Amino acid sequence: MHSLPLLLRQSLRSTGALSRSAHRPIRAPPLPSHLLRLPTAHPRPFSVCLQCQFRTQSASYPPNKESDKPLDTETPSKHPDSTASFLEESLKTQAEAGTPADSTTTTTTTTTSPPPQPTPNEPKTADSSLRDTLPSYLDNRRSQFSKQFTTMMDNLQSNIFVAGQRLNDLTGYSEIEALKKEIHTQEDRLRAARLHVRNAKEAYASAINRRSASQREVNELLQRKHAWSPVDLERFTHLYRNDHTNEVAENEAQEALTAAEREAEEAAAQLSKSILSRYHEEQVWSDKIRRMSTWGTWGLMGVNVLLFLVFQIAVEPWRRKRLVKGFEEKVIEAIEKEREMNHVEILSPTAAAATAGAVAPVEAAGEDAAPAPVEEETTSDGASVVEDTTGGVVEDRADLAHESYKAQLPSLPSTLSVDSWRQYLHDLFSERSMIITQRDLSSVALQSAAAGAAVMGLVIALIRPR
């Protein structure tokens, strides 16, 4: 069987020979106006296959100018039928005219407009604004801290579950959870065993009823034995033969019922044992937790007592010594300031008297010049005597004030003596007014609450019934 291209080639050769002998050139019909405007395709090399010769070629993009298109013509895309018919007519004409197979043919080309390229200066369109609101774009703009926080919140439930599991492992509650699961399994087993017992009872009852009915019918046949017909004889033989089968079925149903009841009893006993074991383990676990809480309460109370003793034995005396030392330094500083002020007040009238004594000899210098040195010496001696007297008085006053302040300071006994503790207790319950900050008041309240809770826990632990 010859191929289609070979047959076409032979037909073209025969028609070409006939046309050459006739010497009658045949003109091709004129092309329509809408096909003349199609761009020409590049010629292809010779190919045996005619389908390859008429393959669609891609051409360059034609200028998209609407002004060049005539108004009275239509585009080729609107005349697909006319284009196909024209191609068929041209093929027939070429075949009749004897054109060689390697002649070039017109090919249809499809023109596609390239996609518009956005310019960089062009404003954002609706697509770009829509792209900015996409979840992926917003997710990429999130900070790393926000992503970590989201991941942590997503894993929070699993982390809490893992922490609870670790706590159960430490306290021993995981074994109790295993016992709970085992109890659920035993409950399912007991439920299935009871259902099996119910089915076995029904099967045993049906076997008994079937055998009883068979025996009842046999007894009826035996009562009218003298009037048996062939059908009755056959029926009696059948019933007598099935009696053994019914007996075996009844015995098997009874054994199955006994086994099902035994299994149900074992499942119930195992369930009761598991429940008792779980109750015992929960009691032990609760006792351990209560014991741990008791020891924790004792430890908290011991810490509070230790802090109280440390504050009363070490911190409180050190604070009192620091306050006393600071008070003494302030008193000494006040005494020094008072001494300096008294010294300045005493020196001011002495300087005024010396100035007045110096002015008087200057006025009398013209009258009596010889006795002037004697008077000057007398004045200087008097001033030195006054200064010595004033300095001695100031020192005596400062010493007296220092001694009086020291006498006014409270005598602090030793911190380990009985008098110090008696004085401290008396000071605790005295009516002395003092200024305290809110922080100190809050710390005292918290310490009192902790001490009260510790004492109440101790009392409850002691009077709790064993």
Curated annotation (Swiss-Prot):
Pfam families: She9_MDM33 (PF05546). GO terms for cellular component: mitochondrial inner membrane. Residues 99-112 have a biased composition (Low complexity). The chain crosses the membrane at residues 295-315, 443-463. Residues 464-466 are mitochondrial matrix. GO terms for biological process: inner mitochondrial membrane organization. The keyword Transmembrane applies. Residues 173-275 form a coiled coil. It is a multi-pass membrane protein. Signal peptide: none annotated. Residues 65-81 have a biased composition (Basic and acidic residues). Residues 316-442 are mitochondrial intermembrane. Keywords: Coiled coil, Membrane, Mitochondrion, Mitochondrion inner membrane, Transit peptide, Transmembrane, Transmembrane helix. Residues 59-134, 366-388 are annotated as: Disordered. It is found in: Mitochondrion inner membrane. Belongs to the SHE9 family. Required for the maintenance of the structure of the mitochondrial inner membrane. Involved in mitochondrial morphology. Causes growth arrest when highly overexpressed. Homooligomer. This is Sensitive to high expression protein 9 homolog, mitochondrial. It comes from Aspergillus terreus (strain NIH 2624 / FGSC A1156).
